Amino acid sequence: MKTDLQLRAINIIRELRQGQNASQAYVAELLDLRSSGLVGNIESPRFPHKYTLKQLSVLCEAFQYPFENLFLDEKETLLPYKERIKLLINKIIDYDG
């Protein structure tokens, strides 16, 4: 089962993909995946698959979206720098856990 944090990041990527009229096949190609079906599995809450941190980085770059915004909400992005970075690191660790 995916965590709330994993679902948040995956849903943001899906919304970015759909907003730019990009297909799951396009995402699969960006990530050098063998099948767009894997992207479907990642986007589905029914399967445990998730993007790796490297894949999220590639997708954020492709969709011109700040990587940290996958993990931090608007309020958290306004925290002082050190506090924000510490929170971001902890959330990235939680995502990957």
Residue ranges and their predicted role:
Residues 11, 21-22, 51-54:
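Residue-level signal for the short linker/turn that defines the boundary of a DNA-recognition helix
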Residues 32-50:
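Recognition helix of helix-turn-helix/homeodomain-like DNA-binding domains
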Residues 2, 71-97:
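Short, charged recognition helix plus adjacent turn
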Residues 17, 28, 60:
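The alpha-helix within a helix-turn-helix
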Residues 52-69:
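DNA major-groove recognition helix of helix-turn-helix/homeodomain DNA-binding modules
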Residues 20, 31-32, 63:
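Core residues of bacterial helix-turn-helix
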Residues 1-20:
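A short, Lys/Arg-rich alpha-helix, primarily the initiator
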Residues 13, 24-28, 39-42, 70:
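Conserved hydrophobic/aromatic packing and binding residues within compact polymer-binding modules
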